[in-house]
């Protein structure tokens, strides 16, 4: 079983998408975690349901900020719990393909390796796929096509615009403006 423990993973500020090659299915959950002190109460969609409605002693946060990992420990726990729900395995020895921003520093890249090989998940092989390439593949764009393709990815807290042609990313620009800010602007204009 070649793809039994192979996953395509997109860690976003709003949601985590995990594609299981073995099951040929994509799982999507909110990238949120609810805690009381150091005790985790809820994760994923359940934590999102508590967002902005929880008592003062419960904190609901996202381990990602503006498309980058803000809390290694919390992001690893969210990813581990999702993989456990999908395949009921412990997350050892898997192959993980992470979609990552194009303009990452070495420290930010190391964070992805740590998430896949930290306390809960171990001995995993990690590969990074640049987000514009992953987006193009997901949309069915022929990467080797010599014509230019503009790829626009509007995330929760950031937007990335890229031009891909002939299998190469010609130009890419990421701005810290996403769906949340657009929603907030629309709501404030309506009020």
Please annotate each region the language model reported.
Residues 157:
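Short glycine-rich anion-binding loops that position phosphate/pyrophosphate groups of nucleotides
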Residues 1-154, 164-191:
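Nucleotide/phosphate-binding catalytic cleft detector across ATP-hydrolyzing
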Residues 160-162:
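A structural feature that tracks compact, well-ordered secondary-structure segments
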């Amino acid at each position: 079983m070649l793809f039994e423990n192979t996953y395509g993973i997109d860690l976003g500020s709003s949601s985590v998408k995990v594609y299981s090659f073995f099951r040929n299915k994509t799982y999507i959950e909110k990238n949120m975690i609810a805690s009381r002190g150091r005790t985790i109460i809820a994760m994923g969609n359940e934590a999102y349901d508590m967002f902005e409605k929880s008592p003062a002693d419960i904190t609901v946060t996202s381990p990602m900020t503006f498309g980058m990992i803000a809390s290694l420990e919390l992001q690893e726990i969210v990813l581990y719990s999702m993989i456990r729900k999908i395949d009921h395995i412990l997350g050892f020895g898997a192959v993980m393909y992470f979609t990552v921003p194009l303009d990452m520093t070495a420290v930010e890249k190391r964070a992805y390796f740590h998430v896949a090989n930290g306390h809960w998940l171990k001995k995993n092989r990690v590969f990074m796929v640049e987000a514009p390439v992953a987006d193009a593949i997901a949309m069915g764009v022929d990467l080797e096509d010599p014509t230019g393709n503009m790829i626009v990815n509007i995330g929760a807290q950031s937007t990335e615009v890229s031009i891909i042609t002939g299998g190469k990313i010609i130009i890419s620009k990421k701005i810290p403006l996403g769906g949340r800010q657009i929603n907030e602007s629309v709501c404030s204009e309506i009020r």
